[in-house]
Amino acid sequence: MRALAQRSDRRLLLLVVLSVMILETVTNQDLPVIKCVLISHENNGSSAGKPSSYRMVRGSPEDLQCTPRRQSEGTVYEAATVEVAESGSITLQVQLATPGDLSCLWVFKHSSLGCQPHFDLQNRGIVSMAILNVTETQAGEYLLHIQSEAANYTVLFTVNVRDTQLYVLRRPYFRKMENQDALLCISEGVPEPTVEWVLCSSHRESCKEEGPAVVRKEEKVLHELFGTDIRCCARNALGRESTKLFTIDLNQAPQSTLPQLFLKVGEPLWIRCKAIHVNHGFGLTWELEDKALEEGSYFEMSTYSTNRTMIRILLAFVSSVGRNDTGYYTCSSSKHPSQSALVTILEKGFINATSSQEEYEIDPYEKFCFSVRFKAYPRIRCTWIFSQASFPCEQRGLEDGYSISKFCDHKNKPGEYIFYAENDDAQFTKMFTLNIRKKPQVLANASASQASCSSDGYPLPSWTWKKCSDKSPNCTEEIPEGVWNKKANRKVFGQWVSSSTLNMSEAGKGLLVKCCAYNSMGTSCETIFLNSPGPFPFIQDNISFYATIGLCLPFIVVLIVLICHKYKKQFRYESQLQMIQVTGPLDNEYFYVDFRDYEYDLKWEFPRENLEFGKVLGSGAFGRVMNATAYGISKTGVSIQVAVKMLKEKADSCEKEALMSELKMMTHLGHHDNIVNLLGACTLSGPVYLIFEYCCYGDLLNYLRSKREKFHRTWTEIFKEHNFSFYPTFQAHSNSSMPGSREVQLHPPLDQLSGFNGNSIHSEDEIEYENQKRLAEEEEEDLNVLTFEDLLCFAYQVAKGMEFLEFKSCVHRDLAARNVLVTHGKVVKICDFGLARDILSDSSYVVRGNARLPVKWMAPESLFEGIYTIKSDVWSYGILLWEIFSLGVNPYPGIPVDANFYKLIQSGFKMEQPFYATEGIYFVMQSCWAFDSRKRPSFPNLTSFLGCQLAEAEEAMYQNMGGNVPEHPSIYQNRRPLSREAGSEPPSPQAQVKIHRERS
């Protein structure tokens, strides 16, 4: 500790000299009035010194008592020494009353820096230097040469820089003096802090401030422990920390909420009970959860007050608390009602507050304060932030144990305000949006064919057009037709900008019209006289015509090139799977996490020479996915089949950056059984390869279509068709599943019940059961069959995968059967291989705006507002369910994507129940297609429902099997699983197209 203290005395000397050379002899009486000022502020920029025009949050200015010092070269003004902590930020400012213009020049270590003098409202010259994030490299002399019409001047500042990394100040704590009934206040810090007791005889908030009720004692030991409010405070160069002696006063009315004391494991506990009575005939006791405290964990003191009443206190203490010290501490007296306090022992600190974003709108001069109500332990350090500038934060305790921080110094500026708080264990951020109401301001203009008006204001203004008669200023007749209001735009945290246009042919020429914009703040109007424009001149001169064409042709060529370039760039590769950060309660209050600045973890790197490429699995405009054999990617000496995702050979830097961002996101995402998981990557010495799991059966869409002829509603039908040829496999295991009745994530998988080294902890029967189940799955795949239970299982697995993505704050944005892959055991995995799909020729992707979008799978808010959330993925999941239970029919069959399609979506149109879906499954689809995204189910809810459906299906199958081959036509006959008759045939895809055309 002594070595640290010696090192802490090391100070960096920073001389900032504002130098002015005298050009003429002056006396003390002739010297101008110069004031040197120090302004401390929060860090907002780089560490280099910047002129005063750099925006910062300034604290109260401190006068440095600038005095003249005679030198042979002229007059030098010297200010008091300034101390600033390393990484601190200050502004050194000189105010001088001198006539005429000023010019200045900063010089630092023989290098010139810019200088911008200005004048304040008192016509004083102001020269400032902001020194931000002070470091050792900034030690030295700063010279500022200021020249005025009268003379030149020099001012000297001396700044000491402290190394704050060696400075510490910890919150003080109490300890009982040995063999004495007294408290010792201890605070650890560098430099060594000074300790004082702050005693107050009042219960009011004034105890925290200077006042007549406050008594200060600069000593470490306190013997008088009868005061109303007792605090121990420690102070050093870093600031001030205080700890209050927690007290229950039996003479005070109990609080409306039970007082609560928080401590962390290992901290000391001190809790005081105080009571006053007319005589000494009473006692005090402490109990913890109705059990008296042990001897030696408390001590009692008593004294008589000035009015001869007895004051008695009982202090309970624990030198180092543990979790067993949590509970209700009750102080009882024979003359007073008992009172309790809840002591909570924490493993680490916390900050509890509502983090949802809040939005306010106020008048331009309305008084308003932001406020945050929170509960925290330990005490927080907080700040308010606006426009990258920090403002001081004040916090005040409330009676219910909460604290509140208010910010009123916003000067009615619109924008986003942030409250940031932290303590040793937690961080908290809350965002506010402030809108300032403003009356619209209208600007008008007229052209040959129309008159238009524009306005800005808040709230969004509305428009009216009125006709005036005989050029009278009284315009009362409203113009109902020929008015077109353009969609309003909003400046960032500012006013709404809107416009309205009147078609002159509708109103007639030669009229006086008035356009008015109005909102809750008032109305603003402009009057326009509509002239009658003459006919457009007809071009008769062929020479002029061809000359015009010749001049325009180069511009047309350039325009075509630009359009082609834009068309090429607009379809740039981007991963559909994105991780989002929600910033507020509304659907559009989020942003995509940008992984470009994240570091790539090289533990995922795989030697590219260990890849042996095979066939191309898919190829598109941006790249391709290839099958490959990876040697040693899962286990040394073992090769497995993988899918390798790569860009095309001539990919640009933006596409390469997008692929690297996708790689970093996948490394953060983690592993899940129903996601195509990342296995590794090749990023060094060549093109970027992303190595994923290989799914042998391709995408779910084509898988379903290929199994249409092999689909059976029940396993009973399969038994009959195959003459029970594989039933003996299960005869020895009557409790095992039917082929295809997989428990997909309904029970823990085998690898989760095994040790880390793979040694199973299952019994032999369980192992045999798993082996038989795997054999059943392989035999089922050989039979090339598909059942209703398989469809239900596919839906459940996709919901599980999306539940995982929702937990990871990811949105897929292109959830469809074509983006779900099938592998062994009919396990399905969600993927994003969009770069290997030719979206230019894929009919599922339709041009909308400047992008190709999977319109028929998109939620209304995504389609019309560009908003993508997990709830929009729920809508897409409903479309995916329709694909599954129609065995791969295109959604909205027979309905082309045109203006009528968008109207259908906006009107709430929903597809009919697919042939293979039950009423329950169709109900899930309809729930997913709720127009209001808030009414759609979450993926955990979908997983739970489908899991129950799957379990019921298996249970029904077991009951109907009864250990023998069933003779009934359907194992589902007792639960009405299908909405059609069991014997009916599904309509063909062409027939389904016809049905939808008729109903739409």
Swiss-Prot record:
Stretches of the chain found on the membrane's Extracellular side: 28-544
GO molecular function, one term: protein tyrosine kinase activity
Annotated GO CC locations: cell surface; endoplasmic reticulum lumen; external side of plasma membrane; plasma membrane
Pfam annotation, one family: ig
Region (Important for normal regulation of the kinase activity and for maintaining the kinase in an inactive state in the absence of ligand binding): 592-598
Active-site residues (renumbered): 814
Tissue: Hematopoietic stem and progenitor cell-enriched populations. Found in brain, placenta and testis.
EC number: 2.7.10.1
Membrane topology, from the record: Single-pass type I membrane protein
Localization (cell): Membrane; Endoplasmic reticulum lumen
Modification(s) after translation: N-glycosylated, contains complex N-glycans with sialic acid.
Reactions catalysed according to its record: L-tyrosyl-[protein] + ATP = O-phospho-L-tyrosyl-[protein] + ADP + H(+)
Glycan-linked positions: 44, 133, 152, 307, 324, 352, 445, 474, 503, 542
Subunit and partners: Monomer in the absence of bound FLT3LG. Homodimer in the presence of bound FLT3LG. Interacts with FIZ1 following ligand activation. Interacts with FES, FER, LYN, FGR, HCK, SRC and GRB2. Interacts with PTPRJ/DEP-1 and PTPN11/SHP2. Interacts with RNF115 and RNF126.
Domain text: The juxtamembrane autoregulatory region is important for normal regulation of the kinase activity and for maintaining the kinase in an inactive state in the absence of bound ligand. Upon tyrosine phosphorylation, it mediates interaction with the SH2 domains of numerous signaling partners. In-frame internal tandem duplications (ITDs) result in constitutive activation of the kinase. The activity of the mutant kinase can be stimulated further by FLT3LG binding.
Protein name: Receptor-type tyrosine-protein kinase FLT3
Native organism taxonomy: Eukaryota, Metazoa, Chordata, Craniata, Vertebrata
